[in-house]
Amino acid sequence: MKPTTIASLQKCKQDKKRFATITAYDYSFAKLFADEGLNVMLVGDSLGMTVQGHDSTLPVTVEDIAYHTAAVRRGAPNCLLLADLPFMAYATPEQAFENAATVMRAGANMVKIEGGEWLVETVKMLTERAVPVCGHLGLTPQSVNIFGGYKVQGRGDEAGDQLLSDALALEAAGAQLLVLECVPVELAKRITEALAIPVIGIGAGNVTDGQILVMHDAFGITGGHIPKFAKNFLAETGDIRAAVRQYMAEVESGVYPGEEHSFH
């Protein structure tokens, strides 16, 4: 199987072909996803909540991300593998580069960082040193204490215009992917159409180029609150491999996410 690359996703955007991505944290699930053709994965700092049992992503360390990245890479050698830089791992461009090098050596193809225009110099430094960057705007979980909880972002003209400005700034600085989380569908459409780079949505409607879900949400194994944008594909299929295929098929056809999973 040919490796999936950033260029693969760029071609999907050009061809208007939606693509599915998912979080992965270990060898076994990574191998299962790859075997079913789901070849874009994120080692997210969401592991702090789903794997480690914390109430936020803030306790996750670079070493945690590197450990899980190495495990996922062994399970899916040809996938496009993104890895989060966790909270306080990129406070300066120099710190970001040092920590990005750690997760890249562990097997990541790209690092994901949360934030807007203040990250421009960091994105430039990373991309100029051969570290591909995925931006993350909207609901950025590392900022949960600023937001006062996990809330929809970008509502209203001023907030929406700021997110669009942030997205354009990240792209101009060299970011090659963007994740949009928990924003109104209308804003997600504006940003997706304004950018040349692929945009991956989570809680952003079906108007983005790709979708991502935390695997625990996709299979209904999350305790407690279930996000509005989540769908339990395992409940519908009764088989985890079939659930992966169903998720991919519904993303590619635009069936998922539906109106019931979207914000306005």
UniProtKB/Swiss-Prot annotation:
Q: Which SUPFAM superfamilies match?
A: Phosphoenolpyruvate/pyruvate domain
What Gene3D superfamilies does the record tag this protein with?
Phosphoenolpyruvate-binding domains
Residue positions of the active site: 181 (proton acceptor)
Tell where it localizes.
Cytoplasm
Describe, as the record does, how this protein assembles with itself and its partners: Homodecamer; pentamer of dimers.
Q: Which GO terms fall under molecular function for this chain's record?
A: 3-methyl-2-oxobutanoate hydroxymethyltransferase activity; magnesium ion binding
Q: What keywords would UniProt list here?
A: Cytoplasm, Magnesium, Metal-binding, Pantothenate biosynthesis, Transferase
Which cofactor(s) are needed, names only? Answer: Mg(2+)
Protein name, UniProt field:
3-methyl-2-oxobutanoate hydroxymethyltransferase
Residues reported to bind Mg(2+) = 45, 84, 114
Q: Where does 3-methyl-2-oxobutanoate bind?
A: 45-46, 84, 112
Q: Which InterPro entries match?
A: Pantoate_hydroxy_MeTrfase, Pyrv/PenolPyrv_kinase-like_dom, Pyrv_kinase-like_dom_sf
A GO CC term assigned to this protein in UniProt: cytoplasm
Q: Please give the function described in this protein's UniProt entry.
A: Catalyzes the reversible reaction in which hydroxymethyl group from 5,10-methylenetetrahydrofolate is transferred onto alpha-ketoisovalerate to form ketopantoate.
Q: In which pathway does it act?
A: Cofactor biosynthesis; (R)-pantothenate biosynthesis; (R)-pantoate from 3-methyl-2-oxobutanoate: step 1/2
Give EC number(s), comma-separated: 2.1.2.11
Q: Which family does it belong to?
A: Belongs to the PanB family.
For this protein, what does the record note about how its cofactor is bound?
Binds 1 Mg(2+) ion per subunit.
Q: Which Pfam families does this entry report, sorted A to Z?
A: Pantoate_transf
Residues annotated as transmembrane: none
Recorded catalytic reaction(s): these are: 3-methyl-2-oxobutanoate + (6R)-5,10-methylene-5,6,7,8-tetrahydrofolate + H2O = 2-dehydropantoate + (6S)-5,6,7,8-tetrahydrofolate
Q: Which GO terms describe its biological process?
A: pantothenate biosynthetic process
